[in-house]
């Protein structure tokens, strides 16, 4: 009975698979499927990176590597490498880190190779280490003095916490959560973003004066910045209007005075006076004296 094209294709694929397996065995190498673990630990505590591979033998060779932008050796030739020498130890094929730091976070890979009847066998296991870090003291931006009716932003930020912290603003020791709904801040109009750490007053009022500080918090811990006082001053609109009116009046008086002086001819008289200056008189007198000098009479 003739076989269908699909059946022939499956036979060809099976044939190539068998050939590939025979090739690996002939070259004395086989690899097992790798595993992946996730380990989460708080900074400065201990963590165990386990190499979960099949049964190991005394002839097995172990290597631990950290994979990042490059590959760095952690355990090689039966010895811990780098700074792991002083703060880690080997327990069988596992690594016990006694004092985890945030720089330890990343992907680790253990490789176990051992001779078998079919050749050299390589087993690989992967461990993803995540280090949780408490927030540091956040950087807070609070203006010292603002005017009523203006839009004002207070900012809070932390760059060290993992996971990323949430931010809560406080005024005079009282938490400002979400939009105000009554209470001591019922005359305020503000919005607090707990993700970005921005507290925004859409139209600040005199009642918003006080001491403000921000707290950054995550699952590991919380820290807050020192309190800073913000003074809200009332904008004196009537005083500004009066000042503008006075300045405009002074400018108008100066302008009218200049026009009046021009009409009365004060500027033209001054010009005529400059034309009849003492210099011309001196010249005339000199000419008359020259005419009557006796030394020139014939």
From Swiss-Prot:
<dbReference type="GO" id="GO:0070160">
    <property type="term" value="C:tight junction"/>
</dbReference>
<comment type="function">
    <text>Junctional adhesion protein that mediates heterotypic cell-cell interactions with its cognate receptor JAM3 to regulate different cellular processes. Plays a role in homing and mobilization of hematopoietic stem and progenitor cells within the bone marrow. At the surface of bone marrow stromal cells, it contributes to the retention of the hematopoietic stem and progenitor cells expressing JAM3. Plays a central role in leukocytes extravasation by facilitating not only transmigration but also tethering and rolling of leukocytes along the endothelium.</text>
</comment>
<keyword id="KW-0796">Tight junction</keyword>
<dbReference type="GO" id="GO:0050901">
    <property type="term" value="P:leukocyte tethering or rolling"/>
</dbReference>
<protein>
    <recommendedName>
        <fullName>Junctional adhesion molecule B</fullName>
    </recommendedName>
</protein>
<dbReference type="InterPro" id="IPR003598">
    <property type="entry name" value="Ig_sub2"/>
</dbReference>
<feature type="topological domain" description="Extracellular">
    <location>
        <begin position="29"/>
        <end position="236"/>
    </location>
</feature>
<keyword id="KW-1003">Cell membrane</keyword>
<dbReference type="InterPro" id="IPR007110">
    <property type="entry name" value="Ig-like_dom"/>
</dbReference>
<feature type="glycosylation site" description="N-linked (GlcNAc...) asparagine">
    <location>
        <position position="99"/>
    </location>
</feature>
<dbReference type="GO" id="GO:2000403">
    <property type="term" value="P:positive regulation of lymphocyte migration"/>
</dbReference>
<dbReference type="Pfam" id="PF07686">
    <property type="entry name" value="V-set"/>
</dbReference>
<dbReference type="InterPro" id="IPR003599">
    <property type="entry name" value="Ig_sub"/>
</dbReference>
<dbReference type="GO" id="GO:0009986">
    <property type="term" value="C:cell surface"/>
</dbReference>
<feature type="disulfide bond">
    <location>
        <begin position="51"/>
        <end position="110"/>
    </location>
</feature>
<feature type="disulfide bond">
    <location>
        <begin position="156"/>
        <end position="214"/>
    </location>
</feature>
<dbReference type="GO" id="GO:0005178">
    <property type="term" value="F:integrin binding"/>
</dbReference>
<feature type="signal peptide">
    <location>
        <begin position="1"/>
        <end position="28"/>
    </location>
</feature>
<keyword id="KW-1015">Disulfide bond</keyword>
<dbReference type="GO" id="GO:0098609">
    <property type="term" value="P:cell-cell adhesion"/>
</dbReference>
<dbReference type="InterPro" id="IPR013106">
    <property type="entry name" value="Ig_V-set"/>
</dbReference>
<keyword id="KW-0965">Cell junction</keyword>
<dbReference type="GO" id="GO:0005923">
    <property type="term" value="C:bicellular tight junction"/>
</dbReference>
<comment type="similarity">
    <text>Belongs to the immunoglobulin superfamily.</text>
</comment>
<keyword id="KW-1133">Transmembrane helix</keyword>
<dbReference type="GO" id="GO:0097241">
    <property type="term" value="P:hematopoietic stem cell migration to bone marrow"/>
</dbReference>
<dbReference type="GO" id="GO:0007286">
    <property type="term" value="P:spermatid development"/>
</dbReference>
<dbReference type="InterPro" id="IPR042625">
    <property type="entry name" value="JAM2"/>
</dbReference>
<keyword id="KW-0732">Signal</keyword>
<feature type="domain" description="Ig-like C2-type">
    <location>
        <begin position="135"/>
        <end position="238"/>
    </location>
</feature>
<dbReference type="InterPro" id="IPR036179">
    <property type="entry name" value="Ig-like_dom_sf"/>
</dbReference>
<keyword id="KW-0393">Immunoglobulin domain</keyword>
<dbReference type="GO" id="GO:0036477">
    <property type="term" value="C:somatodendritic compartment"/>
</dbReference>
<feature type="domain" description="Ig-like V-type">
    <location>
        <begin position="32"/>
        <end position="128"/>
    </location>
</feature>
<dbReference type="GO" id="GO:0031642">
    <property type="term" value="P:negative regulation of myelination"/>
</dbReference>
<dbReference type="GO" id="GO:0005886">
    <property type="term" value="C:plasma membrane"/>
</dbReference>
<keyword id="KW-0812">Transmembrane</keyword>
<feature type="transmembrane region" description="Helical">
    <location>
        <begin position="237"/>
        <end position="257"/>
    </location>
</feature>
<feature type="topological domain" description="Cytoplasmic">
    <location>
        <begin position="258"/>
        <end position="298"/>
    </location>
</feature>
<dbReference type="Pfam" id="PF13927">
    <property type="entry name" value="Ig_3"/>
</dbReference>
<dbReference type="InterPro" id="IPR013783">
    <property type="entry name" value="Ig-like_fold"/>
</dbReference>
<keyword id="KW-0325">Glycoprotein</keyword>
């Amino acid at each position: 009975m003739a076989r269908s094209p699909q059946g022939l294709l499956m036979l060809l694929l099976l044939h190539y698979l068998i050939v590939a397996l025979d090739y690996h065995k002939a070259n004395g190498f086989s690899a097992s499927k790798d595993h992946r673990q996730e380990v989460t630990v708080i900074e400065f505590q201990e963590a165990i990176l386990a190499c979960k591979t099949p049964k190991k033998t005394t002839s097995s060779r172990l290597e631990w590597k950290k994979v990042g932008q490059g590959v760095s050796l952690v355990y090689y030739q039966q010895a811990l490498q780098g700074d792991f020498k002083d703060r880690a130890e080997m327990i069988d094929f596992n690594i016990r880190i006694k004092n985890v730091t945030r720089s330890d976070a990343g992907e680790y890979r253990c490789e176990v190779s051992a001779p078998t009847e079919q050749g050299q066998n390589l087993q690989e296991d992967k461990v993803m280490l995540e280090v949780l870090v408490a927030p540091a003291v956040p950087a807070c931006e609070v203006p010292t003095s603002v005017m009523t009716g203006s839009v004002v932003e207070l900012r809070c930020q932390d760059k060290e916490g993992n996971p990323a912290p949430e931010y809560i603003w406080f005024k005079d020791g009282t938490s400002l959560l979400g939009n105000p709904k009554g209470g001591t801040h019922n005359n305020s109009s503000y919005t607090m973003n707990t993700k970005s750490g921005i507290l925004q007053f859409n139209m600040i009022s005199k009642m918003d004066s006080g001491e403000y500080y921000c707290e950054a918090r995550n699952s590991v811990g919380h820290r807050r910045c020192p309190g800073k006082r913000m003074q809200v001053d009332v904008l004196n609109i009537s005083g500004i209007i009066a000042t503008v009116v006075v300045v405009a009046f002074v400018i108008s008086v100066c302008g009218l005075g200049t026009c009046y002086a021009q009409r009365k001819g004060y500027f033209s008289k001054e010009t005529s006076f400059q034309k009849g200056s003492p210099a011309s008189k001196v010249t005339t007198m000199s000419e008359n004296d020259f005419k009557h000098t006796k030394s020139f009479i014939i």
